[in-house]
Amino acid sequence: MSRNMLDHDFGSDEEDDDFNPAPAYDSDNEDARPTHQDRDDDDDEEDVKPSRRAERRVGSEEADDNEDADGHDDEEEDENDDDDEEEEDEDEEGAVSRPKKRRRKGGVAHFFEEEAGVDEDEDEAEDEEDEMAELGGEMHPDDMDALPVGAETDDRRHRQLDRQRELEASMDAEKQAQLLKERYGRNRAAASDAVVVPKRLLLPSVEDPSIWGVRCKPGKEREVIFAIQKRIEERPMGSRNPMKIISAFERGGAMSGYIYVEARRQADVMDALQDMSNVYPRTKMILVPVREMPDLLRVQKSEELLPGGWVRIKRGKYQNDLAQIEEVETNGLAVTVRLVPRLDYGMNEDIGAPFMDPKRKRPGMNPAVARPPQRLFSEAEAKKKHGKYLSATSGLGGKSWSYLGETYVDGFLIKDMKVQHLITKNVSPRLEEVTMFARGSEDGTANLDLASLAETLKNSTAEDSYLPGDPVEVFRGEQQGLIGRTTSTRGDIVTLQVTEGDLAGQHIDAPVKSLRKRFREGDHVKVIGGSRYQDELGMVVQVKDDTVTLLSDMSMQEITVFSKDLRLSAETGVDGKLGMFDVHDLVQLDAATVACIVKVDRESLRVLDQNGSIRTILPTQVTNKITPRRDAVATDRNGAEIRHGDTVREVYGEQRNGVILHIHRSFLFLHNKAQAENSGITVVRTTNVVTVSAKGGRSTGPDLTKMNPALMSRGGPSGMMGPPKSFGRDRMIGKTVMVRKGPFKGLVGIVKDAGDVQARVELHSKNKLVSIPKELLVVKDPVTGQTIEMGRGRGGPRVPSAAPPSGWQGGRTPMAAADSSRTPAWGGASSARTPAWAGMGGSRTPAWKNDGSRTSNPYDGSRTAYGGFGSRTPAWNAGARTPYGGSGSGQSDFDAFAAGSRTPAWNANSGSRTPAWSGATASNGSKDSRGYDAPTPGGAYSAPTPGAYASAPTPGVSAPTPGAWADSAPTPGAFNAPTPGGPSKKPYDAPTPAAWDSRPYDAPTPAMGGDGDDAGPRYEDGTPSP
């Protein structure tokens, strides 16, 4: 019985303390049982398994405790086994009907799991049990005494959780975010059936949307993109009027002034940008070709800026000044830099200067304007004139001042600038520039950050810094530690031959940024550039990383330069030169002073400046060396040209002489070998010297042709004398002209002003005044556009006469009166008629009498016609009659040829006829002629041609032309037309053409008297008819 009592579990003391014990449910009441109706038998078996394991553990422990008890017989053991089976069956039924609420475990039962909670979701219940098993159940304080030794270590997991939370609380936010990303982030690629797509298939094609470039206001590209983004938010997809563009972006920089919009149609772009400021969609858009789309979207890696790096300023007062980066903003778009200020503290301020228009460009923005030198900020200087603008500010370290709205710390200007306003590539800071940024340490010495400087120089090393044969060393990369000599350079890749190590003799390629020159102590080197010690020679005494310290050959001082600025050299620095300077070199001391070197010392230079003063300066005080100009020209006191190498003499003063060594503006530096002072160098002015001898035998006199601007105005002296110059107002002023040559060819304008060579023309088309050479202008008629000849000048002969016309003759053309040059008028005593004559007019051809306009004499070239009155057409016979009539007196006005000299008629009284005859005023000369005389042109009865007796003059007495008097007959018809027959014809006379009394067969040319037969030709006797 006692054994059976021990086998039963009566519960712990906790059951007695439980105020609300669990109600016992009747096994017959199925509704009160909290079992799930859908659970199967397998689940029930799994739920009761832990209870079975617990009972077995308890039974084993009790059996161990009762090992010393008396033995029992086999029957009792069988009964015990039966009782155990019955208890297990009751436990199974109790486990199934046990409610959800769990009682607190205590004592030893804490270590045993006697029940399994059943929930609606089996999986969630199992997960909760696993978590409780890991973290451990809650312990009651009273149970601590019942725990065995070491049981308190069960809260190990609690302490571990506390430590984990403390560690997470002490973590940085970035590290915590990284840890969470690693823990909960996606650590594997998404499941996909797609294979790797080649990049060429990702390129845009004609099926993809197009990209349109739209013009916008430069500098407003980002604002336009933000406005498009805002409009897309206002008109999303699915709204009544959605935005149909796909994307929009801008590139800036070289592509400023354009934004790029991706869309299917151009109309969609215009609709999206309609009524938007700073963008011009109505202008011509640019359709980006498909092949250029990848280049448009390609992004280049921006330069990484680090604090302590070196940059230069692009524009403004500090243009090209070196600056050091103090801080970089998180977005990388702005930096804080430290630079040496340029301030004048108001010393050069003009109080009376007018107010500067804010729209105009500020003086500080123009690099050409003189700017103050670089100096550290001085509050003492600022207080002198701008004390009201100066105030002290609190800073973490050093002296901080606010002056004119800017901050100065330890004398440096601290300024916030955008990255696009900085030069970040190929900065190449010089050592003297970096020295100004040296920070003072506590012991008073300067502390120069060479590490950041070297890093900047490595990124800006030029490719031409390495020449074949330079010893180099690879200091970073996979090939670090290799030593060799360069053999060739291709861009930024240098090929070198390894000289040391296992790879000796092999050629390898290395980038320029991973190389540095290698020197050893004792090498003789030369500074090649990038430093103020350029061309300095010396011996290497110390090498430390990228810096080399050498001992100068001339100054015997140690200087430190970068290895990239050095090169091995076999030259020596003790040849009378100090670096790049030699005796007799012309150097620039400042903006207004030049000097000639007269002596070179070990550390200094002795110079003679343009004012005649002797100075001793250091090589660093020289601004630059002036290259001698061999073609420089000046003029001496007499105006003669002087050049380099000419010998000149001083006129006033000491009257020194010498050979011209340098010509600089109005100063001459002369060299005299006989003078020992100042190495024979003297300085004089050009206006105080005269030429003694010119180099090469050049003429020493002034070139007068070049001194006369009138001779040089047309390209040089000419052999012909030009036309006389006119005075007064130029004739071309006010004329309409056209340009016939040059850039304004074909344009028409009006001359507003004119000189000897140039004319100021106001062009009609451009409405502006231009200066054009006169020789390129042609005068035009403003109405008809015809060219007007302007070369005759004013005061030329008037046509038809220079004399004023009389009132009754004014209507004639060309006019009649005193001048006989008129053709064909008549009147008065001056016969202008051709071929007739009248009075003493000698203008007839071949007229007679007065001297002039006669046909030349065949027998004497000095005479025209014959004698003093040789106006007659030549003929034979002593009187040289024209055409026939004997040897009448030539002294009479009516000599033998008075009638015959006319062509072809005669009669002085009927001079109005052209030509005719009339009256009894025929010549009293003999009408007899020899038998073989040619009757040319007529005789006493010769028919006049074409005029008649009362033929009208041509053009007439007054206005009507050609008619004259009322009874005048038209010309050529006449009363007696035949010409030139004579008074008595011989049978063999040539009938040319007819006469008044000609035979019936004379040829009537062109007419004869009124009773003549004009109907047809006449025939001589015996002449066959045609």
Swiss-Prot record:
InterPro entries: KOW, KOW_Spt5_1, KOW_Spt5_2, KOW_Spt5_3, KOW_Spt5_4, KOW_Spt5_5, NGN-domain, NGN-like_dom. Residues 98-107 have a biased composition (Basic residues). Residues 905-926 have a biased composition (Polar residues). GO terms for molecular function: chromatin-protein adaptor activity; mRNA binding; transcription elongation factor activity. Residues 1-11, 30-39, 48-60, 153-172, 1015-1026 have a biased composition (Basic and acidic residues). Residues 61-94, 114-133 have a biased composition (Acidic residues). Residues 1-172, 694-729, 788-859, 905-1026 are annotated as: Disordered. SMART domains: CTD, KOW, NGN. Residues 305-338, 519-553 form the KOW domain. Keywords: mRNA processing, Nucleus, Repeat, Transcription. Its main location: nucleus. GO terms for cellular component: DSIF complex. It comes from the Eukaryota. Component of the spt4-spt5 complex. Interacts with RNA polymerase II. This is Transcription elongation factor spt5. The gene is spt5.
